[in-house]
């Protein structure tokens, strides 16, 4: 029997990752896997309360990072680790790579500080697979403008998203064993075929 896996979806706002999350969850369920779908910040009652604060309240950049990791610690303890222990597959819309990208890249917070928090909060847990949906900034912005009211991160300027995207790509280069980069400008059907192949290799 295939060991339960932890899969994360990453990308700048407007990259389209959330569109494909349910597709991957359905693929796994079709192969008789129990699947837990969650998100960050969020996933628990405390995490969802912190999400509202993080997405809408102004704060010091270090406060923002600390709250992200506080929500993550609760998420791991209350949802992710218990699910994996049960043998359930976990799919999370964002995880620690997002904090490195947004707070480290976009906000320019010292990467070493984030690494210390990462080692404290989850020294042994890393995703088995990280799907990074990559897209040019102008495409991402057009998608955001066409969808909904924007939160404080989505309202950031182009240089913030350029730095965030660059940090995502740096993380992918640093951890190539778990990252798969998806060109999110492709047709949905093309992306889903790629996802089907990737998941087939992970969940035979």
From Swiss-Prot:
<keyword id="KW-0418">Kinase</keyword>
<dbReference type="GO" id="GO:0006235">
    <property type="term" value="P:dTTP biosynthetic process"/>
</dbReference>
<dbReference type="GO" id="GO:0006227">
    <property type="term" value="P:dUDP biosynthetic process"/>
</dbReference>
<dbReference type="GO" id="GO:0005829">
    <property type="term" value="C:cytosol"/>
</dbReference>
<keyword id="KW-0545">Nucleotide biosynthesis</keyword>
<comment type="similarity">
    <text>Belongs to the thymidylate kinase family.</text>
</comment>
<dbReference type="GO" id="GO:0006233">
    <property type="term" value="P:dTDP biosynthetic process"/>
</dbReference>
<dbReference type="InterPro" id="IPR027417">
    <property type="entry name" value="P-loop_NTPase"/>
</dbReference>
<dbReference type="InterPro" id="IPR018094">
    <property type="entry name" value="Thymidylate_kinase"/>
</dbReference>
<dbReference type="GO" id="GO:0005524">
    <property type="term" value="F:ATP binding"/>
</dbReference>
<dbReference type="Pfam" id="PF02223">
    <property type="entry name" value="Thymidylate_kin"/>
</dbReference>
<protein>
    <recommendedName>
        <fullName>Thymidylate kinase</fullName>
        <ecNumber>2.7.4.9</ecNumber>
    </recommendedName>
</protein>
<dbReference type="InterPro" id="IPR039430">
    <property type="entry name" value="Thymidylate_kin-like_dom"/>
</dbReference>
<feature type="binding site">
    <location>
        <begin position="11"/>
        <end position="18"/>
    </location>
    <ligand>
        <name>ATP</name>
    </ligand>
</feature>
<comment type="function">
    <text>Phosphorylation of dTMP to form dTDP in both de novo and salvage pathways of dTTP synthesis.</text>
</comment>
<dbReference type="GO" id="GO:0004798">
    <property type="term" value="F:dTMP kinase activity"/>
</dbReference>
<keyword id="KW-0067">ATP-binding</keyword>
<keyword id="KW-0808">Transferase</keyword>
<keyword id="KW-0547">Nucleotide-binding</keyword>
